[in-house]
């Protein structure tokens, strides 16, 4: 799948910088408001076994307007919302659904294609595009990061993802320094002093990453995460619960994916 987005080689940063992902659309139309309301209500709808009922009530032409009006940032937000709703729909009942209804499948697949991604809950949608700062004046750290959307909610799910947000932020310097080394070699300017400086930055960045990893057990119980949270992020290809894959209604000639 070819992405429509272009890497700016003049500004290589990490996967998470100081700029927060978009949390809400402004001046929402009725479909955009419905999408946001449903995505925000996922924990309550899963608790009451109403998620499929609410989504099945949407019309087949839900969110059928032109995607060209959205910026990349807005498309990434929409992809987060559709991804969470799709996975909640498939896995949010006693048995997984073999078919994803057209109201979610069609716009989700189009948005994902526009972003150059498969229509699945990816790490980008689950983590990289799914957080905000509690206090805008503070940095990206475990005391100041919260999720925008989740499945069941609760400390274990939120902590698991916010740890990864902060890990990606801590790894920024390693990515920038790695790129700096590559550029130095390409320009035949990879002196010992440049290599030492950038490799030292990479080491310091990885030390911060490891420090954050060690904090995972503080607020994320492995049993709770594995049995209550993780099932919602499963894919479907070769999954025992959906051995033939998932049918995206109205997409891919309705062949299981």
Show where each model-derived region lies.
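Surface-exposed peri-terminal alpha-helical interaction modules
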Residues: 1-257
């Amino acid at each position: 799948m070819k992405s429509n987005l272009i890497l700016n080689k003049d500004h290589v940063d990490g996967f998470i910088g100081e700029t927060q992902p978009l949390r809400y659309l402004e001046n929402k139309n009725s479909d955009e408001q419905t999408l946001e309301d449903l995505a925000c209500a996922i924990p309550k709808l899963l608790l009451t076994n109403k998620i499929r009922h609410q989504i099945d009530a949407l019309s087949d032409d839900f969110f059928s307007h032109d995607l060209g009006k959205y910026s990349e940032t807005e498309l990434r937000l929409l992809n987060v919302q559709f991804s969470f709703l799709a996975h909640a729909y498939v896995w949010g009942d006693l048995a997984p659904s073999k078919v994803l209804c057209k109201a979610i499948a069609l716009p989700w697949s189009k948005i994902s294609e526009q972003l150059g991604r498969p229509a699945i809950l990816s790490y980008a949608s689950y983590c990289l595009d799914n957080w905000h700062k509690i206090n805008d004046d503070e940095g990206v750290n475990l005391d100041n990061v919260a999720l925008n959307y989740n499945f069941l909610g609760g400390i274990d799910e939120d902590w698991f993802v916010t740890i990864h947000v902060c890990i990606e932020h801590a790894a920024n310097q390693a990515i920038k320094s790695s790129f700096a080394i590559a550029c130095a070699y390409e320009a035949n300017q990879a002196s010992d002093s440049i290599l030492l400086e950038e490799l030292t930055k990479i080491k310091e960045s990885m030390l911060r990453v490891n420090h954050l990893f060690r904090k995972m057990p503080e607020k994320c119980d492995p049993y709770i995460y594995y049995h209550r949270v993780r099932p919602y992020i499963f894919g479907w290809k070769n999954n025992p619960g959906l051995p033939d894959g998932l049918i995206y209604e109205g997409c891919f000639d309705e062949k299981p994916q």
